[in-house]
Amino acid sequence: MDISDISASQLATSPPPITTIDFNSSIEESPAKRVKFAPELTKSFEETLSPTVTLVLRNNEETFDRCLLSFYSNYFRVLFSSKFRDSKSTTHRIRLISAPDLHLLLTIPKAFEQGIKPNISLQKAVELLEPSAFLQMSIPLDYITDVICANLTHENIIKIFRLALLYHTTLAVRVWRAMVRKFQTLFATNVYLTLKENELIGLLTDKHLNLKSADEKTVVVNWIKHNSPLQSDRMAQFAQRNFSRQPQPDATKYEVIRTRQPMDAIVCFGGWASRGVAQNIEVFNTRSDRWQTCNFNYDIPNIRRAYHGIEVVEDKLIVYGGFNGTQQFQTTVLFDLSTKEWRSGANMNDKRCYVTSARINDSHGRPLIFACGGMNGVSRLKTAEMYDYRADQWSEVANMAQMRSDGAVVTIDNKIVVIGGFDGRNIHQGGEVYDPVLDLWHPLSSNMRTRRTGCTAVSIMNQVCMIIGGFNGNRRLDSAEIYDMREGLWHPVPSLHTARSNFSACQMDTCSIYVAGGFDGQATTKESERLDLRSKMWQALPDMSEAKSALRMVTLSDHPFLDELFDIPDDTGIITTW
């Protein structure tokens, strides 16, 4: 069955009511309990029932082991162990699945038990969705859900959503979330015109909807034109009522349904402000292109630092090293963005402020954080160390060739590239590359066009390193240059609007690089700007709420923690009438 073959009569327009499936699927059993259950069930069947059962399936009938069916299917477990008259029958009819497909559903959990990842196509996953949900086979159903969600496109997402409403609420929720994320593409390709009225109203009232404010009214107007008055009457009323609402803070120039939360954001932690370490945590709203102070009401000791390292790894915000005005830190703090809990991690082998840091994945996909150089309060460092957050362990790696503090670091092709910096006497013009497989540093093949310390670097397409700003010993720099690892040469790129050192930079998407804060040679600055890699032009952005240097920025994309940072309420007043 192709998903395009689903007729409208087969599709639900709202989530199904809670059923026995929903109640049973919410009860998780440990593997140990299920393994223990198997011999008990086998013994029970041997004493009271035939060990096999004949199933009359879609295309033929076949004999199966009762214990095997019950072990992987809640449906068969209840059927064979209940006191119903049919429980002891040797024959059962299940017309919605063929024998090969039932064998495939039974093979999926067996493959996982052997450490093998199954491989089925999107088409087969769609075909197996209904029978796996009907038979309440939780492991195959979870896997099928993952396969479908990994293959969603703007062309199939609406039909798959409607199919999911019929059979599996968990899948429907995930596909809905994907529609919210992909809606700008649905708009650009006009696929959204096939949405039903209640579906489009539901999307427009979702605060997470990924749609530019300038396009919001066009979506409604074009959808109404595309559909008959009978189909669009409620949509016209909905638009008339809600587009006349007062201007929203995230889109003052356009008529919009409601305030929306951006899918992507830049979060600024720490830094050095006029009165010491910056206390405010700021977030950049990519919808409104402005900074705003956010509430971060978690009492986490020493998470606010300057000249520190910071990474987001597997939903953990990891802060290490740095300076608070009186001491250099050796400590590590981990904050779980999902559970909102924090804990202290292992100490580094050295105190490190002015530290450069980056992350890579080892050959097993395990994330590793590297802290390179810095200052321990007495001298600049050439040492480097690696943090395995899963094991909560810092391990020393090979030393760099030169002492470096306030350098720039970036990950390219799973190697650590450290550039520029200060050794206590000289500002560096060259860089080094660390190969984690060989545990060796080797120099870059050429030097930058100018010496730089207090600079920042970003990776472009995992092949090109872009280094920005800094201090050359005489003045703050507005220049930037790129180094292509394949070519081994440096090339100039357009200059910043504001010369700065000790600032932060990050790449939001494949086309935009953001910089903020720093020291401009006269004072700490609150200015920020963005480079559009397509036009190769810098654009000035609104200022941060306070001037700060030595700050660190991270990006969060489609993350639940953004709900807390932006704190945009669910505007239930919009939909109560509908």
Curated annotation (Swiss-Prot):
Check the record and name the InterPro entries matching this protein. BACK, BTB-kelch_protein, BTB/POZ_dom, Kelch-typ_b-propeller, Kelch_1, SKP1/BTB/POZ_sf
- Tell me if Repeat is a UniProt keyword of this record: yes
One Pfam family named in its UniProt record: BTB
Where does each Kelch repeat begin and end?
A: 265-315, 316-362, 368-414, 416-462, 464-510, 512-558
GO CC terms for this protein? Cul3-RING ubiquitin ligase complex; cytoplasm
Write out the transmembrane intervals.
none
Q: Which gene encodes it?
A: kel-10
> Which residues belong to any copy of the BTB domain?
51-118
Its recorded name reads Kelch repeat-containing protein kel-10
Q: Which PROSITE patterns match?
A: BTB
What does the organism's lineage look like at the top?
Eukaryota, Metazoa, Ecdysozoa, Nematoda, Chromadorea
SUPFAM superfamilies in alphabetical order:
Kelch motif, POZ domain
